Every structure is written in C-alpha cells, then in structure tokens.
C-alpha cells in the first residue's frame, strides 16, 4: 500500500523519509512542490496528486506536510486517516508534532513507523499497544540507553494486541483515578457585507483524558445529543447503544484520546458570537483611502470573548497604513500586505475599533474588491452549539473517580466580507 513517507517543512525541505519497499527517489516530491506553488494557501494543496508512476497522498499538520507515496490505487481516505494517526502518535509520544521534536527523537520515530506499518500495510496504530512495544522517551531512559547501548523497544509482546479491546492495556493502576473531558467547538462562518450569515457550521470534538485503574466501563450521556450530525467515533464506542439511546458507552483507552468528532450543520443552531462594523473605501485617482472597523460581542451567552485577532490581506496597491486602535495593537507588513490587529478580549461596555488612512501607490487604479476580514477568537466554558454533558457513570470498578468537563468555543475559518 504505502511505499514511502516523506516529511516536509514549510520551507520545502525534506527532513525525514522512510521506505517500506523499494526506495523511491526524493524527486517524486517535485510534483508535490509544483502543486504547493499553485495553491493559494498551504491548506489548499490537493490531498491527492497523480503522477505518471505514483500517487502522492498528503496531509498538513502543525506546519508539516506528511506526504505518502502509493504505487497502486487505494481509498485515499484510508491513507489520510493513517497519516493523521501517525501525526497523533508523534504528538502523544513527544508532546508536540514539530520538526524539532521529530529530529530530537529520530530513532524512536523510525521505530514507531516500523511498527505502525508492516511492509507498507497498517499493523499497530493504537497508542497503548505502541507504548508497550516502544517506550516513550524520558531523560532518564535516554541517559541509560546511551550508557548501556540499549533501545526503547520493549522486551515483551503487548498484552492488548490479541485482546478484543486492543486500545486498552492490561493491569492499569493509578493512585488518583480521574476522567476529564474537553468539549471543543470551532465555528466556520462567512458573513456578508450587510452582516447576514451566508454560511455557518460547527465542527466539534470531545477529547478525553482517562486515568482509571482496572477495566472501567463508562457511559457518557448528554442533555441534547440529537443536535449532533456526522458523528465520528473512537473504536471503543459501542455504536448500537449510541443509535438506540444516544449514549456513549465504552471501555476507554488509557490516557489521552479523541472520543468523538461531530458537526452541527443546521444554520439555525449556529449562534454567531461576534459582529463587525466596517467601512473600507478607496477613492478613484487618489493615493489614499479610509479604513474603519469595530468589533463587538453578539451572542456570547454571558461569557467573555477573548484572544480576538483580525487579519486582513490588503490589495497589492497598498503601500502603508496609518491606523489608530482604541484597544490592542496592530502591525502591517508592506511586503505581504497583511494587516494583523491583536484585540485581546472585548466587553459590551467598550467596543474596540481600528481606524485611519490607507496609503496607495500613486497613479495605481482603484482596487476592484474590498478585502475580507479573517477573525479569530476563543470563548472559555461555552459550547456554542448548546451541547452539554449530563452525567458520567462508571461500571465494573468500585472506586469513585474524579470527573470534570471543560467547554471551549473558538473560531475556525471565520470570514467577514466587506
């Protein structure tokens, strides 16, 4: 299936490659680099690229491209899902999936890739099994390995490999038993010039951190589970129970994992938490223009909207901008023509604004279109869809665990047209 894997940074450097069958030359990545140059943004590089002798299937994660080389036709989503699993494993092992972390742990990276794929086909992808096969790096283990010449590869086969619940290792014991859940929702929206919503959708995930002894059986119920669409489950979820009762019933993996991801596609259920008043104008046959935007809370359910940033890709004829913010600070890059306004948090009592003059190239024609505003924000302790966890029940063990739920709403691709 997968012949080779190349890891490429944003500068276009191939800093790691792994081959499972015959060695594929790095020159095959030239097709990927051509597609990258044509793409308007790094996230818009086609995930599947056809070449005369290969298929290149890639993902973009944490400023890195994972590019796999395929010689026969396979379902692309299958390969994409596996590449995401590789990135998740690096994140779990090293704390971050970055070029520096991968280079610092390059031996463990190759050991993991060797275990995750057998002759190019997925074999062991569950984190609990991999951690029994290959021990996660620690400072003490690194020192011992350098002195003794040993490796992080385990001496025994993982106990869960042949189990009917391979995602959980046996003999788990904790002094403090805890079960925490993070409900994280991202709003993707397009707002037109008049402030009306053209498109709105919520992408949500529930991430779990489970540190429970033994073999607990958990049931997680919600106040309003019917609003969820296109739910994707971790393999531990009993799907029939969800279909009949809308309850998540599962024996959890040990540690951190993604329990479900979901979508709320009904625009009536998507509350837009911020509004933007804008006035951007360029005069014909003039070397200046006006820029005026104000941002405020709209539907925040009584919570504070924080971490607000506004990014604007100005037209190429813009030379400079002389603006005055009532809150926060702004920067303008005259080379990339990108205006970035770091607002911070907002309250209804004081609405932040950014206004001033725009300097244009002398004699240049008036820009045909006004720029779009890209908004980023975060709201703590709020799931904007209204999703709420009702209760968590545990069976099979007699102790009482600590339980907690945290809600976060943030902007995904949130665009305001001017």
From Swiss-Prot:
One GO term describing the cellular component: AP-3 adaptor complex
GO MF annotation: an example: small GTPase binding
Domain MHD intervals: 176-417
Family: Belongs to the adaptor complexes medium subunit family.
Protein function: Part of the AP-3 complex, an adaptor-related complex which is not clathrin-associated. The complex is associated with the Golgi region as well as more peripheral structures. It facilitates the budding of vesicles from the Golgi membrane and may be directly involved in trafficking to lysosomes. In concert with the BLOC-1 complex, AP-3 is required to target cargos into vesicles assembled at cell bodies for delivery into neurites and nerve terminals.
PANTHER family: AP COMPLEX SUBUNIT MU
Name by which UniProt lists this protein: AP-3 complex subunit mu-1
């Amino acid at each position: 299936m997968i012949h080779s894997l190349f890891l490429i940074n944003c500068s276009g450097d191939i800093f790691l490659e792994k081959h499972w069958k015959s060695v594929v030359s790095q020159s095959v990545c030239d097709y990927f680099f051509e597609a990258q140059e044509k793409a308007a943004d790094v996230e818009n590089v086609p995930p599947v690229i056809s070449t005369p002798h290969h298929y290149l299937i890639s993902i973009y994660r944490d400023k890195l491209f994972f590019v796999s080389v395929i010689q026969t036709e396979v379902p692309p989503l299958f390969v994409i899902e596996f590449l995401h699993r590789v990135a998740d494993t690096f994140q779990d092992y090293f704390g971050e999936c970055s070029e520096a972390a991968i280079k610092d742990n390059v031996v463990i990276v190759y050991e993991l890739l060797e275990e995750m794929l057998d002759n190019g086909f997925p074999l062991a992808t569950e984190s609990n099994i991999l951690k029994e096969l290959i021990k996660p790096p620690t400072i003490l283990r690194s020192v011992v390995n350098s002195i003794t010449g040993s490796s992080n590869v385990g001496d025994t086969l993982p106990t869960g490999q042949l189990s009917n619940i391979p995602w959980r290792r046996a003999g788990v014991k904790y002094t403090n038993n805890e079960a925490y859940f993070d409900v994280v929702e991202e709003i993707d929206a397009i707002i037109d010039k008049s402030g009306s919503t053209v498109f709105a959708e919520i992408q949500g995930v529930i991430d779990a951190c489970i540190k429970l002894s033994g073999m607990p059986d958990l049931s997680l119920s919600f106040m309003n589970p019917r609003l969820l669409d296109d739910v994707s489950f971790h393999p531990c979820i009993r799907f029939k129970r969800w279909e009949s009762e809308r309850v998540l019933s599962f024996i959890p993996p040990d540690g951190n994992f993604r329990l479900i991801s979901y979508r709320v596609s009904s625009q009536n259920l998507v509350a837009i938490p911020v509004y933007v008043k804008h006035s951007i104008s360029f005069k014909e046959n003039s070397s200046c223009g006006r820029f005026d935007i104000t941002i405020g809370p709209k539907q925040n359910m009584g919570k504070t909207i924080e971490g607000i940033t506004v990014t604007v890709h100005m037209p190429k004829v813009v030379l400079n901008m002389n603006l005055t913010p009532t809150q926060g600070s702004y920067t303008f890059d005259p080379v990339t023509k990108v205006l970035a306004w770091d607002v911070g948090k907002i309250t209804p009592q004081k609405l932040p604004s950014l206004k001033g003059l725009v300097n244009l190239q002398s004699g240049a024609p008036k820009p045909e279109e006004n720029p779009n505003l890209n908004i980023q924000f975060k709201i703590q302790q709020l799931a904007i869809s209204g999703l709420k966890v009702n209760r968590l029940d545990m069976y099979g063990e007699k102790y009482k665990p600590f339980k907690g739920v945290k809600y976060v709403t943030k902007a995904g691709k949130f665009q305001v047209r001017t």
